[in-house]
Amino acid sequence: MIRLIVFCLLFLGLNSCSSPLTKEITEYRKEYFKEFLSDPRSPLKEADLAKLDFFPAGEKERITASFQPTNDSEPFDMPTYSGLTRKYRKYGVATFSWGNKQATLSLYENLSLLNNPDFDDYLFLPFKDETNGVTTYGGGRYINMSKADAEDGTITIDFNKCYNPYCAYSDGFNCPIPPRENNLPFEVHAGERNFKGAYTAVGH
C-alpha cells in the first residue's frame, strides 16, 4: 500500500525536493489516500488511487479571510445528492478577495458530530466554483476545517486541500449539496480534479 501511495504522489509531481507548501500538501494527500483504504465505506480500491488527480499546490490558493462567527444560528437541513438531509448549523462566515473579486464562504457544524470527542472541533466547508463540471466534480468540493482555525477574527482557507465527495466516484452516498451561498463566481484551480477512473453505479 505505501509503495502505491508513494508512486501516486510522484506521479502527481509531489516529491521531497519541493517547497514547504508542497511538502505539507504531500503529507496531507498521503493521509487522504490512506483514508480510502481504511474506510470500510470507501468507494475506491487500492488500484483506483492512481486515478485520483489534483492541481499542483500553489501559495495563492491558500488565503487568509476575515471571519465573523454567526452566534446562535438556527439548525437547518442541508440536502444531499441522495435526497436525504443532514442537520447542520452555520458557524461563521469568511470574507476574502480572489483576484479582483470579493467572496464569502459559510462554514458549518455537523450537529450529529458535536457529541463525538473526535469531531467536536470539526467544521465543514462545502463549495462550488466555475471549474465544476469541467475540470472538477460537478457537484462541488469540500474542505475539512476546525474551530481552532478561526482565531482573532481571521481564518486561513487552503483550497489546495479541497477534495471530492464520495459521490464523485460512486452512487449510494449521502453527500451534502453545497448551499447556494457558497457558490463562488470564479474558478478555483486547486485541490482535487475530476476522477480519471470509471464511475461506479451500485444502486441504493
Segments (PLM) and residue ranges:
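Acidic, glycine-rich flexible loop segments
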Residues: 126-164
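A mature extracytoplasmic/lumenal domain signature
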Residues: 67, 107-111, 129-131, 159-163, ...
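Extended, aromatic/histidine-rich regions of cofactor-dependent oxidoreductases associated
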Residues: 163-204
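Start-of-domain marker
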Residues: 19-75
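C-terminal motif of bacterial Sec signal peptides marking the signal peptidase cleavage site
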Residues: 15-16
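Mid-length scaffold segments of soluble, non-membrane domains
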Residues: 79-139
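Sec-dependent signal peptide recognition
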Residues: 1-8
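Extracellular/lumen-exposed scaffold segments
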Residues: 46-47, 74-90, 105-107, 154, ...
